[in-house]
């Protein structure tokens, strides 16, 4: 059982805007975006594809569960070709490896964690790309990069536990050796996120990037603070 993410549903994201996004290059750029994914060693490949037209309330025009036979980026692009349109949204799911504190008894393990990647056509949902980006990444749980209860970073601003499970976790972090390990594993996760972000910048004609999360006022600055705290 996951010991310390039961009550922490906040997610972490990356929004990406390209310098130009013509329809005839949409899927080509989507493919380049997908090729940057650092797949989980145990669960490589894309496990789901969904294509919607016009707006979120519309039923998918294409939907396929790929868990039985995960696909690579080129295969996802091939499946999407018949539905190329600037009014469409393309979403895929996959897994990447992050350090998590799980098990019974709980211990640090590098395990597959779900991610979602999205391509927003410029006419989809009244131009939602202007707010969310041409491409989006949902990295998963925010706390895998920021920690719990304000424990990590230079400031270490303590916050009260939000559940008995989190209280138990925070109590265990009162031991210096446990807190040190927590810092190290969280920094490893942050480095993985930043490395992937740099890879995206190198693969695409990026105009702007925004790292953000549901629980942090400045997600990128928070991660940089944790990296700087030694």
Task: Describe the residue ranges of each PLM region.
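Intrinsically disordered, low-complexity boundary segments flanking structured domains
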Residues: 1-3, 124-125
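Acidic, proline/glycine-rich low-complexity IDRs
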Residues: 2-3, 131, 136-230
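Ordered hydrophobic segments in well-structured contexts
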Residues: 11-15, 100, 116, 134-138, ...
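Short, intrinsically disordered low-complexity segments
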Residues: 36-122, 176-180
